[in-house]
Regions:
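Positively charged, small/polar-rich N-terminal and surface patches that mediate targeting and assembly
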Residues: 1-121
Length: 121
């Protein structure tokens, strides 16, 4: 059995009404080192129920790569800056991936914790 250390990261999925707002949020997160990288996908169609009506809107989606534990700070920041009353913010924790990328994200965001990853070889 091989035991390898892997940096912990989180992926934060978030939407914004425009590419301009998404870019402003992404820039602030990367500049403050709350995020190592943010991908922005524009012109995504969203259908949702709001106050009893089905709405359809175009949105930009952000996929934010951050260090473990920083998603709470990201959520706090975004809730203050976002134009939506109830912004979509979802956190995912990858269990596998490129160890070098995980370490890069941890380094950029100043996260030093690692986890043990036990694998059968």
């Amino acid at each position: 059995m091989e035991c390898e250390k892997k940096a912990q990261i989180e992926l934060v999925y978030m939407t914004a009404p425009t590419k301009i707002e998404a870019r402003a949020i992404a820039h602030a997160l990367v500049a403050s080192k709350l995020a190592a990288c943010v991908n922005i996908f524009q012109e995504v169609e969203a259908l949702y129920n709001w106050e009893g009506d089905v709405k359809t809107e175009k949105e930009s989606v952000m996929l934010i790569k951050t260090g473990m534990g920083l998603s709470r700070k990201i959520t706090e920041f975004v809730k203050k800056e976002h134009s939506y009353e109830c912004p979509c913010i979802m956190v995912m924790r990858p269990t596998d991936g490129n160890k070098d990328f995980f370490e890069w994200v941890a380094k950029i965001t100043n996260v030093t914790e690692v986890i043990s990853d036990h694998r059968m070889t």
